């Protein structure tokens, strides 16, 4: 039995609960706490049934237990506007924060594009962009590593049932954060992000459209090869990531149409947007946990 790094999850909604199922399978991470603000929350009840300690008084109610339970990584699946405070309080106790909100106070991480860059940087807060960002930025990066991209636009369509109250409150932050990461991580000079929440019944699988305008005529063979290689990288942790059509070339425009089917851990398989976000968060935390177990990463308290 290898040593596991103890984790806490903040926010027992769709994302937090789906993440809990994934962490339960992790060889490096052990979820021990679930933190919420509503004692009647379904997510907290489910976490209790799964053997976790729970707290319904927010992060403040959890702080006294951090050191005694040796919690070293926390996942924030709440909302962008409370994340900064949550992060400050936990960083002060030496807890590494994986941010699944669009707060983006830490550096962006999209695993197949830049996870390795985070190794050895000793960051205490890493932001997972958004579900739309995780699904589309690898495709923008696949084009921009072949040749310069002047403009990258992504359209993420998710089912209404998969978008909980937290996601809805964060729509503006979603578009800003995703557009910023299309530039910073995807490599586009200018980025734009659009989200569509589709109320259709039965719920639709997550669909993503990516358009890139290249500065010069696109090298079709190299871009096609790069896109297929990147899809294989994403499929290592999200097997339901699939190319529906493309790349389609029209002048300098390169378009890719993706579909993301989930594993069905918490919500049914249509909620690929949950899967790609939680799988990316778990993958990132596992990399840090492996370093901690090896002794190459020691977390230090950060006082704001």
Swiss-Prot record:
Its EC number is 1.2.1.10. One of its GO terms (molecular function) is acetaldehyde dehydrogenase (acetylating) activity. Disulfide bonds: none annotated. InterPro entries: Acetaldehyde_dehydrogenase, Acetylaldehyde_DH_C, NAD(P)-bd_dom_sf, Semialdehyde_DH_NAD-bd. Keywords: Aromatic hydrocarbons catabolism, NAD, Oxidoreductase. The keyword rRNA-binding does not apply. The active site is at residue 131. Pfam families: AcetDehyd-dimer. NAD(+) binds at residues 162-170, 273. It catalyses: acetaldehyde + NAD(+) + CoA = acetyl-CoA + NADH + H(+). GO terms for biological process: catabolic process. Belongs to the acetaldehyde dehydrogenase family. NCBIfam families: ac_ald_DH_ac, PRK08300.1. This is Acetaldehyde dehydrogenase 2. It comes from Dechloromonas aromatica (strain RCB). The lineage of its organism: Bacteria, Pseudomonadati, Pseudomonadota, Betaproteobacteria, Rhodocyclales.
